[in-house]
Regions:
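Nucleotide-sugar donor-binding/catalytic module of glycosyltransferases
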Residues: 1-151
Length: 151
């Protein structure tokens, strides 16, 4: 059963003060509670770092790591190197998660007995609706390497 496994939620942060609090609130309110939130500040020049520090002070699941600006890939890699979870979820700093997103992903892993799950998204800001698939036929079956390549 996957329900007791730690998920590392990695959030690259770079000059996103406008969106960041809504993103972090949505992570903090997840129904799946066994998470660590790895915030990697990639040399922000706005108040993004201060916002991250505020969340780290009020919730010990949040951890902040700072680096000079290296770009998104290096920032995600840094987050992975700092993570302790058995599972990893990447969340962009302008994303807002449904409150049960992580729980649903873990549930799907358990039901389907797979190593990797992905979800789609809904873009509320531009009225472009791309809902998550509910049809299990869409689920990729194969080994982890093939699944990663298909993403």
């Amino acid at each position: 059963m996957y329900y007791n496994k730690l998920i590392s939620v990695i959030v690259p942060v770079y000059n996103v003060e406008e969106y960041l609090e809504e993103c972090l609130d949505s992570i903090q309110c997840q129904t799946y509670k066994n998470i660590e939130v790895i915030l990697v500040n990639d040399g922000s020049t706005d108040s993004s770092k201060d916002i991250c520090e505020k969340y780290c002070e009020k919730d010990n699941r949040f951890k902040l790591f700072c680096q000079p600006n290296k770009g998104l890939s290096a920032t995600r890699n840094r987050g992975m190197s700092e993570s302790k979870g058995e599972f990893i979820s990447f969340v962009d700093s302008d994303d807002v998660l449904k409150e049960d997103m992580l729980e649903q992903l873990m549930k799907q892993m358990s039901v389907e007995k797979v190593d990797i799950v992905e979800c789609w998204y809904t873009n509320d800001k531009q009225e472009l609706d791309l809902p998550s698939p509910k049809d299990a036929e869409i689920i990729f079956k194969g080994n982890s390497e093939e699944a990663l390549v298909s993403l």
